[in-house]
């Protein structure tokens, strides 16, 4: 499972002219389920995301998490994170999970986030979204959780 995490002062997602998700200070999380991902990868990614220390402490060091600062999470599905352009100029998205699997894993991830964090907003899976943000820093961190092999 892939995530592109951006520290923001504020962010919002608009679908068909209506705001469907909005946060103030916090993390904008672009999320992509890859082929082979399960709920386990989503759980591991969520734990990492909530503990990711990319907010400044009193000394100005990145030493605080979104939980520490009471920030929001805005989670937006983005299958294009699985793009592979190594074979030419047109990217392939074959590494992304099938749409039905992607939707299921996205919904499980958002539900899990809402169970563990007080302020969680989301985009709309599969919609044409406009994402507005004020980047803070900028700080952008890619995260990837690879499926663990099952014992034989």
UniProtKB/Swiss-Prot annotation:
It is an enzyme of class 3 (hydrolase). A motif (Gly-cisPro motif, important for rejection of L-amino acids) lies at residues 137-138. Its main location: cytoplasm. InterPro entries: Daa-tRNA_deacyls_DTD, DTD-like_sf. One of its GO terms (cellular component) is cytoplasm. Its EC number is 3.1.1.96. One of its GO terms (molecular function) is Gly-tRNA(Ala) deacylase activity. It catalyses: glycyl-tRNA(Ala) + H2O = tRNA(Ala) + glycine + H(+); a D-aminoacyl-tRNA + H2O = a tRNA + a D-alpha-amino acid + H(+). Keywords: Cytoplasm, Hydrolase, RNA-binding, tRNA-binding. One of its GO terms (biological process) is D-amino acid catabolic process. It comes from the Bacteria. It is found in: Cytoplasm. Homodimer. A Gly-cisPro motif from one monomer fits into the active site of the other monomer to allow specific chiral rejection of L-amino acids. An aminoacyl-tRNA editing enzyme that deacylates mischarged D-aminoacyl-tRNAs. Also deacylates mischarged glycyl-tRNA(Ala), protecting cells against glycine mischarging by AlaRS. Acts via tRNA-based rather than protein-based catalysis; rejects L-amino acids rather than detecting D-amino acids in the active site. By recycling D-aminoacyl-tRNA to D-amino acids and free tRNA molecules, this enzyme counteracts the toxicity associated with the formation of D-aminoacyl-tRNA entities in vivo and helps enforce protein L-homochirality. Belongs to the DTD family. This is D-aminoacyl-tRNA deacylase. It comes from Aromatoleum aromaticum (strain DSM 19018 / LMG 30748 / EbN1). The lineage of its organism: Bacteria, Pseudomonadati, Pseudomonadota, Betaproteobacteria, Rhodocyclales. The gene is dtd.
């Amino acid at each position: 499972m892939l995530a592109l995490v951006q520290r923001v002062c504020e962010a919002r997602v608009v679908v068909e002219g209506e705001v469907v998700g909005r946060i103030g200070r916090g993390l904008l999380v672009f999320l992509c389920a890859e082929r082979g991902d399960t709920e386990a990868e989503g759980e591991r990614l969520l734990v990492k995301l909530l503990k990711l220390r990319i907010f400044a402490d009193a000394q100005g060091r990145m030493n605080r998490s979104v939980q520490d600062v009471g920030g929001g999470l805005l989670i937006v599905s983005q299958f294009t994170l699985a793009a592979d352009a190594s074979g030419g100029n047109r990217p392939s998205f074959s590494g992304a999970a099938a749409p039905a699997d992607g939707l299921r894993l996205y919904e499980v991830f958002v539900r899990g986030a809402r169970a563990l964090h007080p302020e969680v907003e989301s985009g709309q899976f599969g919609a044409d979204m406009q994402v507005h943000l004020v980047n803070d820093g900028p700080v952008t961190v890619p995260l990837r959780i690879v499926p663990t092999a099952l014992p034989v």
